[in-house]
């Protein structure tokens, strides 16, 4: 699982700027699940080969008792609870404040590793400016500048030093001994645990009729028709007889971690509620992660034909970016429609890991060009010459030629459709990369 770093601090100390720096994004919202995260934003970061999740929070006032500040404090406490490391951000230029002391007092009781990031430290005499921050009792302040990128690598190195990162898997992607890691993802109460319980034939995961009653991701070994699986319930496990209250029961972090750790994601939708913003955000993250995906609409038996038609349109419109994914209709509680789900999952993984021969790719490419040439860009028309596979899971197809920087997105989608049709690829995203010759006259037309 990817480690989780939570950014905590009072308002206007530069947390969002640091978030953008760590995630190499100006967007500050990589996975903002509407209605669930409010003032918590989630993004992916990387230091070399080490990947992690960053949680950005709103300004933290631990003693707030009402209004928006109380809600923001609640959100921040939840971010701390689901994190592995807390990065406590302070403002060097403003010095230590009473709010900083309040936050430090809270963090000392949180039981988490805490790093003190002294932000806005560019161009300052660090020893003099940082000395006062020792009084917070958070250890040595680490001087950083979110705006200028100074000290970021040292901060991340300290944050990640205690984590063992997974070594590359020695088993080939198509090795029959390799289990397919399947993440069952979706909003609270769409039936994730019920579906897995039905598959396993036992209450291995405790399912209650209440949104979000499971908590931490759990992996369950499973075998069907000779194929090994590892099922991941992204909401997680709540053990029988152990009752606890969570500030917010649906854990976005666990969902993101499970998706990142999976080979195939089964995205579960609720037929009685249609496609929501939360569904679309989760689907978008799955696509960005490059994971194979199957859509399953649960509680299909609970809606009439008119509602089914509306739902189909909603899926086509709101999840158009997942049009490559098969859509299946099921009832987990009644065990209806579950058989085809397994075939779709196996097909999606087979498609994601399929080996595509260069001669066949090139033939399909040239046939597509003969059927429909790319549009001219001024005096030049892009010349597509040959293609080869650049990667698996998801499939990457690299196309070589001249003036390929002028190939439109629409034409790339056309080519993707031709490749998908020929190789019968279902349930996996596909990436097409264009590589032009440096000299447009280096290769003569054949």
Curated annotation (Swiss-Prot):
Q: Which residues form the EngA-type G domain?
A: 3-167, 180-353
Q: Where does GTP 1 bind?
A: 9-16, 56-60, 119-122
Q: State what this protein does.
A: GTPase that plays an essential role in the late steps of ribosome biogenesis.
Which CDD domains does the entry link to? Answer: EngA1, EngA2
| InterPro entries for the chain | G_ENGA (IPR031166), GTP-bd (IPR006073), GTPase_Der (IPR016484), KH_dom-like (IPR032859), KH_dom-like_a/b (IPR015946), P-loop_NTPase (IPR027417), Small_GTP-bd (IPR005225)
Record gene name: der
> Subunit structure, per the record?
Associates with the 50S ribosomal subunit.
State the protein's name: GTPase Der
Protein family membership: Belongs to the TRAFAC class TrmE-Era-EngA-EngB-Septin-like GTPase superfamily. EngA (Der) GTPase family.
Q: Which UniProt keywords apply?
A: GTP-binding, Nucleotide-binding, Repeat, Ribosome biogenesis
Task: Cite the binding residues for GTP 2.
Answer: 186-193, 233-237, 298-301
Superkingdom, natural source:
Bacteria
Could you state a single Gene Ontology molecular function term? GTP binding
Q: Where is the KH-like domain?
A: 354-438
Species this chain originates from: Methylibium petroleiphilum (strain ATCC BAA-1232 / LMG 22953 / PM1)
Biological processes per GO annotation: ribosome biogenesis
